[in-house]
Amino acid sequence: MLVLINTIQEQASEAIKQATDIVALEQIRVDFLGKKGKLTELLKGLANLSAEEKPKVGQLVNQAKQGISALIETKMIELKEKQLLAKLAAEQIDVTLPGRNHSTGSLHPVTQVKHRINDYFSRLGFDIVEGPEIETEFYNFEALNIPGHHPARAMHDTFYFGDGRLLRTHTSPVQIRTMEQRKPPFRLIAPGRVYRCDSDVTHTPMFHQVEGLLIDKQATLAGLKGLLQDFFAYFFGRELALRFRPSYFPFTEPSAEVDIECTQCNGKGCRSCKFTGWLEVLGCGMVHPNVLIAVNIDPNEYHGWAFGMGMDRLAMLYYGIDDLRMLFENDLTFLRQF
């Protein structure tokens, strides 16, 4: 029995030395120490031995089992180290290679247009003011000379809330709130999001607008015209012809709509301007006396002018975009151009 135990130990030791990977080593463990392994079979045979031989043989088998387990554990550590070194060698990183930069984003074209507008007017001393997008009918309509029965309200397809509040249809409410809080003279612009029930190639339910306001004792329509001529020359980088057409807005009197020379054909006529040579860009006029009275400003002492234009419309003209909806579809392929 002693010879058999020694033979099994030698076989196990040799097999462990020859093992080249963890799978082979695990198979050796099963062959010698598993439920049907060689040493396990010896332990099962103790029942056939005499009472005197059982303790001695059992002790020898357990010693052999411990010795083989120790050899397997040592070999396992060795194989794992080799496996790790092989993996590191295969996955070696060349630290001298240049890194990969993350793609850099850019400002949305409408945001870029907003910044250009803000830069221009802030240099002229205009304050940039903002206000709530959820408004009351007073600030959105009534204070702007648009009472409940006024037919001009039909011009605004408005988003109403159940409690009578609404999504503002222009940024004019910001001007009303500012005039309530400040004493003239002052000048300001109010950029922001506005909302109307409209959606097509040139309209979206939400769009961006900027309105300007100046209240002074000597405000004139001629001064407004000169300012707008200078602004569009700055914005488009060249002098453009302007055309003022008489119009009607409840909050200004007189009122005008302003066209600029087509930026695509230089006024010669093309599809962009519907072959007229002109592009409509804004509405303006002298602030109506009723608007001044609504905010406790004496119209006999102070006068003012106001204008409003769509920033999305300016972005389309500046960048040559045909469909307004492209600005809001979050298409990175399109937006990366800017």
UniProtKB/Swiss-Prot annotation:
Cofactor field: Mg(2+)
Subcellular location: Cytoplasm
One annotated GO molecular function: magnesium ion binding
Cofactor, how bound (note): Binds 2 magnesium ions per tetramer.
List of residues binding Mg(2+): 253
Protein keywords: Aminoacyl-tRNA synthetase, ATP-binding, Cytoplasm, Ligase, Magnesium, Metal-binding, Nucleotide-binding, Protein biosynthesis
Domain of life: Bacteria
Enzyme Commission code(s) on record: 6.1.1.20
Disulfide-bond pairs as recorded: none
Gene Ontology process terms (BP): phenylalanyl-tRNA aminoacylation
GO CC annotations on file: cytoplasm
Top-level EC class as recorded in UniProt: ligase
Main localization, broad class: cytoplasm
Chemical reaction(s) catalysed: tRNA(Phe) + L-phenylalanine + ATP = L-phenylalanyl-tRNA(Phe) + AMP + diphosphate + H(+)
Family matches, as NCBIfam families: pheS
Assembly and oligomerization: Tetramer of two alpha and two beta subunits.
Family, as annotated: Belongs to the class-II aminoacyl-tRNA synthetase family. Phe-tRNA synthetase alpha subunit type 1 subfamily.
Protein name per Swiss-Prot or TrEMBL: Phenylalanine--tRNA ligase alpha subunit
Lineage of origin: Bacteria, Pseudomonadati, Pseudomonadota, Gammaproteobacteria, Legionellales
